[in-house]
Amino acid sequence: MKPTHARYWVVVLALALAMIMYIQRVAISQAIVPIAIDLHLNKEQTGLVLGAFGLSYALFEIPMGLLGDKLGVRWVLSQLVLIWSLFTALTGAAWNLASMWVVRFLFGAGEAGCFPNLTRMLSAWLPLSERVRAQAVMWAFGRWGGALAPPVAFFVIYHFGWRLGFVALAMLGVAWVAFFLPWFRNDPAEHKSVNAAELEMLESSRKLVLHATAVDLRALAI
């Protein structure tokens, strides 16, 4: 029996989300000029707005990853994408420096959990021989999302304005969750599209990793 290829759909989901998160992340760089004009922000205040994301991302990346370990990727990642998409939309509702800073800070807190949870998802769904390649492609798609963000954001802002533009960009995350949540399972064994051969491939790889880890620990104990 040949293995099924359900795991490749997991990779596609990871690649799509990596691209979406970078589009939503970088879009503010294209909107910052009209934002600064409408909210009467000077250069220092604009810097505070742009820096809010980086601060929260650094603070929450590890906790959000641990949350995925404890509660499972399916639920945690779905909630995180909805949370950061909500704050993407709420970017368009900000009315002053404080509100914009809070919104961007909370947006960063949501996005901070993306790559830790995607990494866990790929480790559960891919054999060891495919993980490094999938991780590399996922990071590349993220950067392509960053490259696509300027023209996409410019198009959206030009046609809808920056406020409605962020609402439109938020819909990308909502659409992703609408497909991911009903389809994905934390354990490949629980997925109806995974046959016995594909499951055996994944289980064998998992046992190999556990064996190698045990050998390393015994070596350290000597």
Residue positions per predicted region:
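Small-residue-rich transmembrane alpha-helices and their cytosolic helix-loop interfaces
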Residues: 18, 50, 54, 81, ...
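Extracytoplasmic
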Residues: 9-43, 64
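Cytoplasmic helix-loop-helix junction between adjacent transmembrane helices
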Residues: 103-142
